[in-house]
Amino acid sequence: MRKIKRDDEVIVIAGKDKGKRGTIKRVLQDGCYVVSGVNMIKRHTKPNPMQGKQGGIVEREAPIHASNVAIFNQETGKADRVGFQIQEDGTKVRIYKSTQKQIDA
């Protein structure tokens, strides 16, 4: 089970976008995340008339490394760490380390 999953709200804790919040759009295999509205880059694309694509400057999100983001705790309003807890029925759930509350409630 991953500590940070798709659609989790995260906050950037290091880098040029430090302090920005967004949701996870994609989880990549190399330990990176694509976060909405964070780490924006400008991509210069050529027009492709065969596919009907127009050229120009396209702004999109670039991947950000997992060590530069942390899950955002709504209750405390700060970045938090993720822990795991095994419940009585044997299921494994994610919890916030600071408040011991369940993330996937």
Swiss-Prot record:
GO terms for cellular component: ribonucleoprotein complex; ribosome. One of its GO terms (biological process) is translation. GO terms for molecular function: rRNA binding; structural constituent of ribosome. The keyword rRNA-binding applies. SUPFAM superfamilies: Translation proteins SH3-like domain. InterPro entries: KOW, Rib_uL2_dom2, Ribosomal_uL24, Ribosomal_uL24_CS, Ribosomal_uL24_KOW, Translation_prot_SH3-like_sf. It holds the Pfam family KOW. Keywords: Ribonucleoprotein, Ribosomal protein, RNA-binding, rRNA-binding. Part of the 50S ribosomal subunit. One of two assembly initiator proteins, it binds directly to the 5'-end of the 23S rRNA, where it nucleates assembly of the 50S subunit. Belongs to the universal ribosomal protein uL24 family. NCBIfam families: rplX_bact (TIGR01079). This is Large ribosomal subunit protein uL24. The gene is rplX.
